[in-house]
Regions:
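Extracellular/lumen-exposed scaffold segments
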Residues: 41-352
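Acidic, Ala/Val/Gly-enriched low-complexity intrinsically disordered segments
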Residues: 2-5
């Protein structure tokens, strides 16, 4: 397999901007790349696919597959799960619902038959991924993003129907030191009367990776704004966690300083922590949902626990909107100039190259 094309552009930092600003850039890049240059991923044929596309998309950075779990077939009241299973190449990662300091969460858009209703992604516990002075939340290795599907009592595929067709458009940002927006179109046919359980082990593991809810917020499950930090108290965690160091993942972005170590300790069965607020904070919630999990090395799966923290005390004023640093602005302008005299070769199926991303960033610079 041929190696990556050499990059003639000035190197750009790994998403070194607040996620609010990055979101604007990345979404714009995504649509420019997908519509103008035709570099979206092509679906490869999986088991019993239906046009247009198959159940698997492969890029140089990930393999993404639309999978299903319907142990009793597809019918009213029967359990039905769909999911996108992403297998990352080594050192590459995609993002959680709150991507952290930079990045974008994976997005799923479903096209389902009448009577089937897809819920939200049941996000597994993420891992903290350090990139220089930043901290992101996401996944490496293989992860399944499961989605519960409700089958209505009115579901009526017809007396001669044997299968239902599920279609999915997914978009994800995959990063190493560089970030590449990718998308895929997936199609899968599910038998109505027969069992679909080929990926039952993966769905069982994904179920165990879901954060378990703690008791409703109380005086022992709260957060207190204290100057430029948040004092957190959480009771009701399993006894097996007592005395151990925990990771806290806020579900809401741009509230806490993701890369700051903070301080934490146990007071009997109550876990307490002091976590600095984000320098570019843009949210001031009265309730902050968080996920807690034991701190481990690498991407080892571990159970997580979800709490809705009642936030007390006045929030400081939110930070002014961030601007692009002079160094990044200079690099973007230089890359835009180079892009005018260099046309990249066709990218591999499914991937937009960093050189293309740099050129588009330069073109967008005037709109920041």
């Amino acid at each position: 397999m041929a190696g990556p094309e050499p990059n003639p552009f000035y190197p750009l930092p790994h998403c070194t901007m607040p996620s609010r600003l990055f979101h604007r850039l990345a979404v714009t890049l995504f649509f420019i790349a997908a519509s103008a240059l035709g570099i979206s991923a092509r679906a490869q044929f999986g088991p019993k696919p239906a046009n247009p596309g198959g159940s698997t998309v492969t890029t140089p950075h990930v393999q993404a597959e639309l999978v299903a779990h319907a142990p009793q077939g597809v019918g009213p009241g029967q359990p039905l799960w769909l999911g996108l299973q992403i297998t990352h190449q080594p050192d590459w990662h995609t993002y959680w619902k709150n991507p952290g300091d930079s990045g974008l969460p994976t997005e799923l858009t479903w096209q389902l038959p009448a009577g089937l209703d897809a819920g939200d992604i049941a996000w597994p516990v993420p891992h903290k991924i350090a990139i220089g002075t930043l901290a992101n939340y996401g996944y490496e290795g293989t992860v399944l993003l499961p989605v519960p599907v409700t089958v209505a009592q009115t579901f009526a595929p017809g007396p001669l129907a044997k299968d239902v067709t599920v279609q999915l458009k997914a978009s994800w940002l995959v990063c190493r030191k560089e970030c590449i927006p990718e998308e895929g179109h997936f199609t899968l046919q599910l038998p109505i009367q027969s069992t679909t359980a080929l990926h039952s082990a993966a769905f069982d593991a994904a179920q165990k990776a879901q954060p378990q809810p703690l008791a409703k917020a109380s005086v022992q499950q709260q957060a207190q704004v204290d100057g430029d930090a948040l004092q957190v108290r959480v009771a009701g965690l399993p006894a097996a966690l007592r005395g151990k160091t925990l990771d806290l993942f806020p579900e809401m972005p741009e509230v806490l300083h993701n890369a700051a170590p903070g301080t934490q300790q146990w007071e009997g069965d109550v876990w307490t922590a002091r976590i600095p607020l984000a320098e570019q904070r843009s949210n001031s919630p009265s309730t902050l949902p968080v996920v807690l999990a034991e701190r481990v090395q690498g991407s080892t799966p571990r159970p997580g626990y979800r709490a809705d923290l009642t936030v007390q005390g006045p929030w400081p004023a939110v930070a002014a909107k961030a601007s692009v640093s002079p160094a990044l602005e200079a690099a973007l302008k230089a890359n835009a100039a180079l892009a005018g005299s260099w046309l990249p070769p066709a990218a591999p199926s499914g991937a937009s190259s960093l050189t293309l991303t740099a050129a588009l960033l330069g073109a967008l610079l005037g709109g920041l």
